[in-house]
């Protein structure tokens, strides 16, 4: 069933913000979007020159028309304008049992000028914030809300000050907060660049939860100013929650989407740039949780995979008739390819500006390190010394190194994980079927491939790919299939090289 989301916000006739922007974002994430308009505005890329409020009763009528007909568990709110409309929203959340509410406050400009009346702010804090799954204010709004809730004020000089604001908001009653540091560029040391005279490096997003803070720095784009970035971010978070992602992943993906939309923004009118909301436009050819099955059984993949499972090496491995030398060659080649994967993950971490991507790269490296320790021990059991394994790199290993490094540079963590799938398939569909009974020559290797440590690493890799497979373009899916095809070619080449009497591996 298709995921749904409703936005309650103002209308922007020029399409750059408001419900028009929200609906574009929903569509780009393959989420069916509905809307309730709170005001009709006359605006363009230069500015707003007219606002016509919709009566609160008619806002309620719009919401009811949608939600009495279509099941929806996620709501995104934008500009609500007055107390009457705000009360309608609160009542609708309760009436329709909306599970997750994403709130873009829109109570102040980036400079901190208040856009709403004090009585609105009072009701906003008292009634809407407690119902919000996540609040997504700019830093000025976060400070205003904090002042209202706790009478505290924090001066922003460094990243740690932003985190402090988030912690205080959580302590004051906000469930989760994503702070957008609009108009404040940060230097490479995470101090405000305007105070240190250092060149701007980072645009900061900070996700704050009861469990801690997640820093999501993005490259500062000095030449890119565009309308609708808050709409894009909050609607992307709502979309990701609607398709079932957890909040951290939903926010990470939303930040990446917003950054990409900003990077690809274009000059359409005479004022600010227009975001490329369609930068992730896709109708994915698989359902949630079916990405791995989709790529495994894709028509371009199946013939290559069959050429592997029907390879004489694999047939003999399953039967227990594979001689020692081909198996030794296979172990050596697999060792080098694991090292290549670890090096590519390390290179990706070194060049990444995303803390979460660095963390995931580190996990891959740690998993490969643990695997290699066991792998070397197994190699020794089958008559291979450490010097035999490491002293030289066959040509296939050098070619694989170029491939996996290029993949890491172009496609990051997801590309590396896709390139690791052939061996995952080998374990799942070949090794798991081998009965390593008495007399089977490679019991230690089979048992290792089946043990809890190995299967746990595989499960983590597959879960990561599934989680991140909902927010990619169709062209990216095709590109990833291309990576998998090349990786399967290398897997086949490993089998050919291991089986060949003419090839030298050690």
UniProtKB/Swiss-Prot annotation:
Keyword ATP-binding: yes
Gene3D superfamilies per record: 3.40.1190.20, Heme oxygenase-like
Annotated CDD domains: HMPP_kinase
Record field: catalytic activity: 4-amino-5-hydroxymethyl-2-methylpyrimidine + ATP = 4-amino-2-methyl-5-(phosphooxymethyl)pyrimidine + ADP + H(+); 4-amino-2-methyl-5-(phosphooxymethyl)pyrimidine + ATP = 4-amino-2-methyl-5-(diphosphooxymethyl)pyrimidine + ADP
E.C. code: 2.7.1.49, 2.7.4.7
GO molecular function: ATP binding; hydroxymethylpyrimidine kinase activity; phosphomethylpyrimidine kinase activity
Broad class of the protein's primary localization: cytoplasm
InterPro entries according to UniProt: Haem_Oase-like_multi-hlx, HMP/HMP-P_kinase_dom, PM/HMP-P_kinase-1, Ribokinase-like, Thiaminase-2/PQQC
Coiled coil: none
Alphabetized UniProt keyword annotations: ATP-binding, Cytoplasm, Kinase, Nucleotide-binding, Nucleus, Thiamine biosynthesis, Transferase
Biological-process GO terms, alphabetical: thiamine biosynthetic process; thiamine diphosphate biosynthetic process
Any Pfam family matching the protein: Phos_pyr_kin
Protein name: Putative hydroxymethylpyrimidine/phosphomethylpyrimidine kinase 1
